[in-house]
Amino acid sequence: MASRWVDEVAERRDLDVTWRIMSLAVLNEDKDVSDDHRAFLPRSLRYARLVASLGEVVGAEVIKPLYDALGTRIHPGGQKDAEEVIAAALAELGLDAALARYADSDEHDAALRASHFDGISRVGQDVGTPIIAVNDVAFFGPVISPAPTGEMALTLWDGIVAAASYDGFFELKRSRTREPQFD
């Protein structure tokens, strides 16, 4: 959801956005997490490996479109079969189906981990995704739903960047009251 919001802000503010990979599988590999969460991590790692690998092999410009193609199928689409999700995402982007092999390859794990740890090093280990960095200001979040548009997208952006730029600002949170809204 945050990526949709950042897209909206980038379009209205002419931001130069560099998309990176933050892997929940890497983040949680040595942590005690619930069995349900642990069961998802191998599939999550496959997606992260695919995106990181194609960022290396095809180029960084594929990261965001691939992230969107995968994410749209997984989240609002509810698809759970990684093989189908990956094949459909590659087809949507006009990429060779053989590139799916990278989902199961550790060939570019160094790039995946470097991207992951670049983000985590900016905000700390006790966060998740998304991580947003604006110049020297970085933060976890926001966790939002639905993604704001128009002036509200800009208002939220300005407020969050302003709050996060205060050196002593660490956390602002409230409980979620709804499931993600993709429309």
What spans do the regions from the language model cover?
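Structural alpha/beta surface segment adjacent to cysteine/selenocysteine redox centers
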Residues: 1-86, 160-163, 171, 180-183
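C-terminal cap of thioredoxin/glutaredoxin-like
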Residues: 6-10, 83-183
